[in-house]
Amino acid sequence: MRTNAPDLGADLLVAFLNTLDVEDDVDQLADDDGHRRWAGEHGLQPGDREEAQRVRDALRAIIDGEDARLPDFAVPIDPRPGSVTLGARTAAEAAVASAVVLDIQGKLGRVKLCGGEDCRWAFYDASRNGSRQWCSMEVCGNRQKARTFRAKERES
């Protein structure tokens, strides 16, 4: 049976985290239209916009290794014959459910924020040893390596 339920995996979580674009100073959840648009593009109901922002900011902090508290709310459970699924309907519920699913699978640590100081884009680290630091080695990795090189040259 095919449902319209969102895929509660890394892609959804990364997309939700990236509703805040640090480099371009764009927050897709800053207004109701952007929030509705993002939720609709992912097959979700928008829910409360401010709650979605709080959830996003808390999840970004958690992913970045900071101590953060998620707002209290319940993600509905949808029992069906032969399965029990998380019935996330809103953007915030789906993001939290995705994080929980990934954590249960031991994969939440693979969701990271780019080490580029001016980027901070979320990405899923699919490398074999989980050591990727940047969303893109070609862009952010090279920028950071160039900064490090220039700083070392100035010191010597």
Spans of features found by a protein language model:
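Short helix-coil boundary/hinge micro-motifs
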Residues: 1-113, 117-124
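BZIP DNA-binding basic region
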Residues: 94-95, 106-150, 154-156
